Amino acid sequence: GGPAGKQNAVNQLLVLIYDPKSYKD
């Protein structure tokens, strides 16, 4: 998974908080 990169900063923060392992820039 992971954010598209150009999504909302809030969305990225949520990913970092709830699923940090899936957050890969």
From Swiss-Prot:
GO terms for cellular component: extracellular region. It is found in: Secreted, Extracellular space. Keywords: Copper, Oxygen transport, Secreted, Transport. Its main location: secreted. GO terms for molecular function: oxygen carrier activity. Belongs to the tyrosinase family. Hemocyanin subfamily. This is Hemocyanin subunit 3. It comes from Maja squinado (Mediterranean spider crab).
